[in-house]
Amino acid sequence: MKQQANLIRAGQVIEHDGRRWTVLKQQIITPGKGGAFIQVEMRDLKTGNKTNERWRTADTVERLMTDNRDYTYSYTDGDNLVLMDGETFEQFLVPAELLGDQAPFLQDNMAVIVDLVEGDPVGIHLPATVTLEIVEADPVVKGQTASSSYKPAKLSNGVKVMVPPFIEAGERIVVRTEDSTYVERAKG
């Protein structure tokens, strides 16, 4: 399906130069002189290579339609994730590299959404937030104000995040999986 380049969004799958690409980032740039253009960072689905491409906002690109399917993560088998279809209980292998930076947030029995193009997996979406435990947190530096100061902390999955000074080791917090940022203390 053809669409204007300025409608490209992260997560979409497009066809360009005879290859399939998944869009990682996009930014519309409006220079002081001349027309606006869109800068797109994308990854080749077959080779995994990344590239940047620029289009004028009026250009058209071929967007591939994706099917979204719900699966449950079972376990990791080498370089693949084993997912289970909740309706048919069939197991489905997906390359682990599709997760990218979100891989540490994958937990047993987590519900995930897999994007498929003609039956081939092209992307995995985790829930927007996960609850994890703080295993290590720096002490609060005396004299810091609570309004804008954050301190580093290490989560149970090994990811480091910046948390408010009142958070201590042993507490459970909610973390945004997209960018590894602190959201709030876990309730309950």
Swiss-Prot record:
Pfam families: EFP (PF01132), EFP_N (PF08207), Elong-fact-P_C (PF09285). GO terms for biological process: peptide biosynthetic process. SMART domains: EFP, Elong-fact-P_C. Pathway: Protein biosynthesis; polypeptide chain elongation. It comes from the Bacteria. One of its GO terms (molecular function) is translation elongation factor activity. Keywords: Cytoplasm, Elongation factor, Protein biosynthesis. This is Elongation factor P.
